[in-house]
From Swiss-Prot:
EC number: 6.2.1.75
Protein name listed in UniProt: Indoleacetate--CoA ligase
Keywords for this protein: ATP-binding, Ligase, Nucleotide-binding
UniProt entry tagged with the keyword Transmembrane helix: no
Assembly mode: Monomer.
Record's function text: Involved in degradation of indoleacetate, the most common member of the auxin class of plant hormones. Highly specific indoleacetate-CoA ligase which catalyzes the ATP-dependent activation of indoleacetate (IAA) to indoleacetyl-CoA. Also activates some closely related compounds such as the non-physiological compound (2-naphthyl)acetate and phenylacetate, which seems to be a fortuitous substrate for IaaB.
GO biological process terms, semicolon-separated: fatty acid metabolic process
Amino acid sequence: MELSEWIDRHAGLEPGKTAIRFPERDLSYAQLAGLVERLASALKASGVAHRSCVAYLGYNSPEMLATLFACARLGALFMPLNWRLAGPEHRQLLADCPPSVLFVEPRFVAQIDAFRDALADVTLVAFDAPPQGWISYEALLERSGDAVPRDPQVGPQTPLLICYTSGTTGKPKGALLSQGALAWNAVNSIDLHELSADDRILTTLPLFHVGGLNNQTTPALSAGATVVLHPKFDADATFDAIEQERITLTVLVPAQLEMMIARPRWQSADLSSLRMITTGSTIVPERLIREVHRRGVPLVQIYGSTETCPIAAYVKPADAQRKAGSAGRAAPHCSLRIVGDDGHDVKPGATGEILVRGPNVMNAYWNDLQASAAVLKDGWFRTGDMGHQDGEGYLWVDGRKKEMIISGGENIYPAEIENLLGESPDIAEVAVVGRLDERWGEVVVAVVVPLEGRTLDAGHVLQLLEGRIARYKLPKEVVFLDELPRTALGKVRKDDVRQLVARKTFMEQT
């Protein structure tokens, strides 16, 4: 089967049920199925064929999801673009994977129109008055004709989604995910969340990342649930939706949770409809987990990446407090290994690189054989994350392999120090990086963002660690910032932090 059959099936079973609830308008499953059908026909009339690419630049919207399912019907590739990127970055991605059709929401039209000459073979679609050389969304839909028959060549093995990695270092890579990867990911999500047609999902994460698209949104539509979709995250709008829409499930990354907890409204908000909140994308501070549990809502962690669609492991709600801080066990249709530098499995409790295998893992990186070969070996995806498993098989993520600090020959994992400092009620954010040092090779630097209204000094920060970790792990320097640089999904850009620390050191020495 191909993924648009999910929508058709529920349109047949409950045509009037709300599939997507968006500000000021709802789409029933029948209406969503009709839009997908019309859009697929219009795209086909515009030259989109099997393996063609369709790109979309805009905030979360029903049209964005409909485009994904229309591409699934045609066997085409859907490429959602990160609206936080600058024009030259979008130009780079569109050159890496040239689309046949590019949908652009109003706020971003000028940005794309600035390099329109480089998109001569692309049908450019605007949602309001189109510039010269563009067409309107309505004009595109008018190209639709007869229903598009299902193509027997389109199935689970057919590539569907190109999601570019966050690009925390170097050139972003496009992870190529098949229709089967999204389908198996939905099965994993349904198991974790016990998803059913009765659920009401709130999506605030951007759909241009697998975290927003596939943690709950596409799984919810596969289950016939209702997705309450926000264009982008706003803390107060999130509170409103949870209370007024009686939301049962949502995904919030730690940075979003921090913003909500900082609001006075957090203490009294009605969260009684929530069965759980799912989080991930970065290591989750234990104080954050405790605070959400204090409000009576299980906070469950997912482990995964763009390349795993993303769900590879998770903690079930029953274990959320007992295993606070763990990324859980392997999802039902995934396997995990922890391997040492020799490629052999390490013993429980020992740290090694996390490997993932399963039908939800990407096919390859688009247009990058070398990078694909480096991470896909013998059927396993090498995540680049370091972690260990306890005696019960629960995964604990220790940090990125490339972020490990080697000081005086000793291996130091930043996540250990970050977790300890993150417990402090005076610290909002922390990132630990290495700085080059003539004597030790590298030394530890803690970059700290104090909680608003709090005053900290280096001595206070170091005191939080004294006696809790080996002395060689203690930061040799503490840097204070107002905020940390982050990706769209809330991951700290460690390369930017390292560069900032290096510049500071250089300025002090000159």
